[in-house]
């Protein structure tokens, strides 16, 4: 069976700080992994596809990296109100 684990479950950083979110898979997923952010009342917004390609109109504060079974999302210059998937809660300290 295919397994996908997003970590950490929660991360905190100050406004303007940087956080890293990891996605570990049981098989190679690098060409198929995409990162989305939820939008209340709307479909999720695509941030990154093919593990590291920034979607059109998305800020360069978001960076995808890694390959194979471990893919990473790095978010820099944090702002309030950022959240990612059901797997990671991002708390921005004001």
UniProtKB/Swiss-Prot annotation:
<feature type="region of interest" description="Complementarity-determining-2">
    <location>
        <begin position="50"/>
        <end position="56"/>
    </location>
</feature>
<dbReference type="Pfam" id="PF07686">
    <property type="entry name" value="V-set"/>
</dbReference>
<feature type="region of interest" description="Framework-4">
    <location>
        <begin position="84"/>
        <end position="93"/>
    </location>
</feature>
<dbReference type="InterPro" id="IPR050150">
    <property type="entry name" value="IgV_Light_Chain"/>
</dbReference>
<feature type="region of interest" description="Complementarity-determining-1">
    <location>
        <begin position="24"/>
        <end position="34"/>
    </location>
</feature>
<feature type="region of interest" description="Framework-1">
    <location>
        <begin position="1"/>
        <end position="23"/>
    </location>
</feature>
<keyword id="KW-1280">Immunoglobulin</keyword>
<dbReference type="GO" id="GO:0002250">
    <property type="term" value="P:adaptive immune response"/>
</dbReference>
<dbReference type="InterPro" id="IPR013783">
    <property type="entry name" value="Ig-like_fold"/>
</dbReference>
<dbReference type="GO" id="GO:0019814">
    <property type="term" value="C:immunoglobulin complex"/>
</dbReference>
<protein>
    <recommendedName>
        <fullName>Ig kappa-B5 chain V region 2699</fullName>
    </recommendedName>
</protein>
<feature type="region of interest" description="Complementarity-determining-3">
    <location>
        <position position="83"/>
    </location>
</feature>
<feature type="region of interest" description="Framework-2">
    <location>
        <begin position="35"/>
        <end position="49"/>
    </location>
</feature>
<feature type="region of interest" description="Framework-3">
    <location>
        <begin position="57"/>
        <end position="82"/>
    </location>
</feature>
<keyword id="KW-0391">Immunity</keyword>
<dbReference type="InterPro" id="IPR013106">
    <property type="entry name" value="Ig_V-set"/>
</dbReference>
<dbReference type="InterPro" id="IPR036179">
    <property type="entry name" value="Ig-like_dom_sf"/>
</dbReference>
<keyword id="KW-1064">Adaptive immunity</keyword>
């Amino acid at each position: 069976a295919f397994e996908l684990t997003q970590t950490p479950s929660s991360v905190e950083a100050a406004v303007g700080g940087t956080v890293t979110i990891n996605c570990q898979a049981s098989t190679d997923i690098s060409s198929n992994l995409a990162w989305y952010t939820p939008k209340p009342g709307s479909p999720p917004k695509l941030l990154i596809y093919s593990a590291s390609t920034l979607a059109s109109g998305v800020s360069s504060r978001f960076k995808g990296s890694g390959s194979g079974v471990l893919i990473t999302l790095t978010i820099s210059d944090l702002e309030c109100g950022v959240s990612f998937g059901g797997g990671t809660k991002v708390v921005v300290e004001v």
